[in-house]
Amino acid sequence: MIAGYENSDINLYDKPDDWEDRVGKFIPEEDRKVIVSSPTKRCISTAKLLFDRFPCEVTKSLGEFECKALGNKKFWEITEEEFNRLVFLPASTMEKRAKIVLHDMGNDIRHENNTNAVIAISHGMLIRYIYHYMTGNPGISAYDVINSKGFKFSNLDLLIVDTVKKTVEVHHYKDPIVHK
């Protein structure tokens, strides 16, 4: 999560009628009992919207990074050099965070709740980085992750990570947004 990022809520009536058929079907009912979320209103509301209940746990272990120096610029509006000058976020920091999250979700929370699955609702950057980490690209730059290089992930998409088998599945709700 980006520190200071808009902590807006989402409309709980905006759930697309076809989300369950297109994406939700990949999460069996028995795997929906444990939902963990970032503390932002948007993530908490997403749990309520998609699963009709609030998260059973809100965690700050998903982390955030500081990018106030970017001002109001959108990530896709700046060059990599400009980003690297203004934001210090090496791949090693993202890798540490991914390992913590995967360990927490894959081991601690799963075992504490006696379940085979944990639904984690987080932010696009962390989700995109975990995809790269799990598919053998842990050294990708923060700039490339933020700008979706090599992996697009949009609202209502689903990333399933099996921490035991070390596999990743991606289910897109709709075609990813492309910024110009």
Residue ranges and their predicted role:
Residues 10, 26, 57, 64-77, ...:
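Acidic, low-complexity terminal tails and accessory targeting/binding regions
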Residues 49, 53, 104, 108, ...:
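Active-site catalytic microenvironments for nucleophilic, acid-base chemistry
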Residues 125-128, 136:
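Short Gly/Pro-enriched loop/turn and capping motifs at secondary-structure junctions
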Residues 1, 42-46, 65-68, 127-130:
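Short catalytic/ligand-binding loop motif for oxyanion handling, primarily in non-cytosolic enzymes
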